[in-house]
Amino acid sequence: MVNSTHRGMHASLHLWNRSSHRLHSNASESLGKGYSDGGCYEQLFVSPEVFVTLGVISLLENILVIVAIAKNKNLHSPMYFFICSLAVADMLVSVSNGSETIVITLLNSTDTDTQSFTVNIDNVIDSVICSSLLASICSLLSIAVDRYFTIFYALQYHNIMTVKRVRIIISCIWAACTVSGILFIIYSDSSAVIICLITMFFTMLALMASLYVHMFLMARLHIKRIAVLPGTGAIRQGANMKGAITLTILIGVFVVCWAPFFLHLIFYISCPQNPYCVCFMSHFNLYLILIMCNSVIDPLIYALRSQELRKTFKEIICCYPLGGLCDLSSRY
């Protein structure tokens, strides 16, 4: 794992570190030394400062989301609790990647006696990243299930998704993902671990896609049924659909940002010596940047899609330190 960092390689997990280390040797064997010394098959270098900067931005943004949800009682609903879980996962993924940049720098600059300790720290960070990835996927799936219940079981929703039940679900998600993440790193020498992670990723996406196909095919029918009920049923149903659309955007961004990373893993398993696969895998650092961008983009989506959350952001950022600035800005 140490040798894989000499060309500025910043790997996000121990098994990915190992795969990137083999990248150049595979290119050399199959394509000749001239190809591996430069061009498409040379590892793309990204400055460590970029990783650290994105990590800090993600940390501040997602802390803001967590504080806003905790502060505003109007946001104490199942969907926002799951969003809070997603924000924690995003924050840990991005901050851990930024922290690993520092660890890798220390790994390359310290002597042999201290490298073993640094490697152990790196493995702990890898476990956090892997656990957070799994928690992100599970949190997105939980939000999808929550939106499904709000649309198809609107009248029974509050009996089904109680706050206590949501807290238990989130606790179980993080407990299971933490154990799984640690096991993935412990047994990272096996290709079966990568295959398992890829399978989990696409299985979760398939489940969410199935829920959404059903939701959007039947949503209009349920809106018509709710509309004939007294009170504000139609308004509530419209808000539920808005939440479903918000999650659609979140899932879309998640897929765009994470798909290249998982495609890298698929190529590493299936065609590690194919010239096109090697060329794609040489941009691994770029895929890590995309992953961190996902953690930066998600809080912006929350703010754009939720007026209540946006209002709370404004109160936290402006009103406390700057007094009446929020009152002034609200007039315009």
UniProtKB/Swiss-Prot annotation:
Lineage top rank: taxon: Eukaryota
Localization, UniProt: Cell membrane
Locate the lipid attachment (S-palmitoyl cysteine).
C318
Molecular function per GO: melanocortin receptor activity
> Which residue spans belong to the Extracellular compartment?
1-43, 107-123, 187-191, 272-280
Task performed by this protein: Hormone receptor that acts as a key component of the leptin-melanocortin pathway at the intersection of homeostatic maintenance of energetic state. Plays a role in regulating food intake: activation by a stimulating hormone such as anorexigenic alpha-melanocyte stimulating hormone (alpha-MSH) inhibits appetite, whereas binding to a natural antagonist like Agouti-related protein/AGRP promotes appetite. G-protein-coupled receptor that activates conventional Galphas signaling leading to induction of anorexogenic signaling in the hypothalamus to result in negative energy balance.
Membrane-spanning ranges: 44-69, 82-106, 124-145, 166-186, 192-215, 249-271, 281-304
- Lineage of origin: Eukaryota, Metazoa, Chordata, Craniata, Vertebrata
Gene Ontology biological process terms from the UniProt entry: adenylate cyclase-activating G protein-coupled receptor signaling pathway
- What GO cellular component entries does it have? plasma membrane
Record note on quaternary structure: Homodimer; disulfide-linked, also forms higher order oligomers. Interacts with GNAS. Interacts with ATRNL1. Interacts with MGRN1; this interaction competes with GNAS-binding and thus inhibits agonist-induced cAMP production. Interacts with MRAP and MRAP2; these associated factors increase ligand-sensitivity and generation of cAMP.
What is the official name of this protein in its record? Melanocortin receptor 4
Would you identify the family this protein belongs to, as annotated? Belongs to the G-protein coupled receptor 1 family.
Q: Which InterPro entries match?
A: GPCR_Rhodpsn, GPCR_Rhodpsn_7TM, MC3-5R, Mcort_rcpt_4, Melcrt_ACTH_rcpt
Q: Which residues are glycosylated?
A: N3, N17, N26
Chief localization = membrane
Ligand binding (Ca(2+)): E100, D122, D126
Q: Disulfide bonds, which pairs?
A: C40-C279, C271-C277
Tell me which UniProt keywords the record has, alphabetically: Calcium, Cell membrane, Disulfide bond, G-protein coupled receptor, Glycoprotein, Lipoprotein, Membrane, Metal-binding, Palmitate, Receptor, Transducer, Transmembrane, Transmembrane helix
Q: Which Pfam families match?
A: 7tm_1
Membrane side Cytoplasmic: residue ranges: 70-81, 146-165, 216-248, 305-332
Q: How does it sit in the membrane?
A: Multi-pass membrane protein
**PANTHER family, alphabetized:** G-PROTEIN COUPLED RECEPTOR
